[in-house]
């Protein structure tokens, strides 16, 4: 145990001596900076920074360049929506006649209108000189009015009208028709200087529309018709065929 204690004493003395020597040495002034050394190697790339704020638009100072060449056509687009119908075009030329159709079934004549009338008289003469044949013999479809002496068309078509009037005086009669508010007369006259009984007759074919009227009219100064039991005057008419 004596040896370790001796080494401890020696160590303490050595430290004390070194401290004394250091305190006795004078401190020298600092030296000047030396020349720059050689640049070191580039360091490793740093991390990617955040995106910066947009820059202000630049002021265009150059001259606008020429128009470039036309680019290649792009791919076709999708079909658009259907538009509104356009106006009707002009009528085209007539086509070729079609084939002849098959024969139809026979019609029923009973279902066809057959206007016809016949009346005798006269019973009277109206103020407008219309001869009224008041005694009706036939009045199919009720087309003749025996109180006015007028036929009224109910079926458009072609009609035949006739009259036979007995007189022993000069007489002038006319078949008159109204169509579209226009009066169309057809006159017949007979002169009797001897006072014998004679028959004045007339007839015509008329194309009538629905609502047209036909009647017999006398001349105011030459229209004396015989009234008696020996002879009758008659006014008749009927449809020949209807209009297509």
Swiss-Prot record:
<feature type="glycosylation site" description="N-linked (GlcNAc...) asparagine">
    <location>
        <position position="146"/>
    </location>
</feature>
<feature type="modified residue" description="4-hydroxyproline">
    <location>
        <position position="85"/>
    </location>
</feature>
<dbReference type="InterPro" id="IPR008160">
    <property type="entry name" value="Collagen"/>
</dbReference>
<dbReference type="GO" id="GO:0006958">
    <property type="term" value="P:complement activation, classical pathway"/>
</dbReference>
<feature type="binding site">
    <location>
        <position position="198"/>
    </location>
    <ligand>
        <name>Ca(2+)</name>
    </ligand>
</feature>
<feature type="region of interest" description="Disordered">
    <location>
        <begin position="28"/>
        <end position="94"/>
    </location>
</feature>
<feature type="modified residue" description="5-hydroxylysine">
    <location>
        <position position="48"/>
    </location>
</feature>
<keyword id="KW-0964">Secreted</keyword>
<feature type="modified residue" description="4-hydroxyproline">
    <location>
        <position position="45"/>
    </location>
</feature>
<keyword id="KW-0325">Glycoprotein</keyword>
<keyword id="KW-0180">Complement pathway</keyword>
<dbReference type="GO" id="GO:0005576">
    <property type="term" value="C:extracellular region"/>
</dbReference>
<feature type="modified residue" description="4-hydroxyproline">
    <location>
        <position position="54"/>
    </location>
</feature>
<dbReference type="Pfam" id="PF01391">
    <property type="entry name" value="Collagen"/>
</dbReference>
<keyword id="KW-0176">Collagen</keyword>
<keyword id="KW-0391">Immunity</keyword>
<feature type="modified residue" description="5-hydroxylysine">
    <location>
        <position position="67"/>
    </location>
</feature>
<feature type="modified residue" description="5-hydroxylysine">
    <location>
        <position position="100"/>
    </location>
</feature>
<dbReference type="InterPro" id="IPR008983">
    <property type="entry name" value="Tumour_necrosis_fac-like_dom"/>
</dbReference>
<feature type="modified residue" description="4-hydroxyproline">
    <location>
        <position position="39"/>
    </location>
</feature>
<feature type="disulfide bond">
    <location>
        <begin position="172"/>
        <end position="189"/>
    </location>
</feature>
<feature type="modified residue" description="4-hydroxyproline">
    <location>
        <position position="79"/>
    </location>
</feature>
<dbReference type="InterPro" id="IPR050392">
    <property type="entry name" value="Collagen/C1q_domain"/>
</dbReference>
<feature type="modified residue" description="4-hydroxyproline">
    <location>
        <position position="57"/>
    </location>
</feature>
<keyword id="KW-0399">Innate immunity</keyword>
<feature type="domain" description="Collagen-like">
    <location>
        <begin position="31"/>
        <end position="109"/>
    </location>
</feature>
<keyword id="KW-0379">Hydroxylation</keyword>
<feature type="glycosylation site" description="O-linked (Gal...) hydroxylysine">
    <location>
        <position position="48"/>
    </location>
</feature>
<feature type="domain" description="C1q">
    <location>
        <begin position="110"/>
        <end position="244"/>
    </location>
</feature>
<comment type="subunit">
    <text>Core component of the complement C1 complex, a calcium-dependent complex composed of 1 molecule of the C1Q subcomplex, 2 molecules of C1R and 2 molecules of C1S. The C1Q subcomplex is composed 18 subunits: 3 chains of C1QA, C1QB, and C1QC trimerize to form 6 collagen-like triple helices connected to six globular ligand-recognition modules (C1q domain). Interacts with CR1 (via Sushi 24 and Sushi 25 domains). Interacts (via C-terminus) with CD33; this interaction activates CD33 inhibitory motifs.</text>
</comment>
<feature type="glycosylation site" description="O-linked (Gal...) hydroxylysine">
    <location>
        <position position="100"/>
    </location>
</feature>
<dbReference type="Pfam" id="PF00386">
    <property type="entry name" value="C1q"/>
</dbReference>
<feature type="glycosylation site" description="O-linked (Gal...) hydroxylysine">
    <location>
        <position position="67"/>
    </location>
</feature>
<keyword id="KW-0732">Signal</keyword>
<keyword id="KW-0677">Repeat</keyword>
<keyword id="KW-1015">Disulfide bond</keyword>
<dbReference type="GO" id="GO:0045087">
    <property type="term" value="P:innate immune response"/>
</dbReference>
<dbReference type="InterPro" id="IPR001073">
    <property type="entry name" value="C1q_dom"/>
</dbReference>
<comment type="function">
    <text>Core component of the complement C1 complex, a multiprotein complex that initiates the classical pathway of the complement system, a cascade of proteins that leads to phagocytosis and breakdown of pathogens and signaling that strengthens the adaptive immune system.</text>
</comment>
<protein>
    <recommendedName>
        <fullName>Complement C1q subcomponent subunit A</fullName>
    </recommendedName>
</protein>
<feature type="compositionally biased region" description="Low complexity">
    <location>
        <begin position="79"/>
        <end position="94"/>
    </location>
</feature>
<feature type="modified residue" description="4-hydroxyproline">
    <location>
        <position position="73"/>
    </location>
</feature>
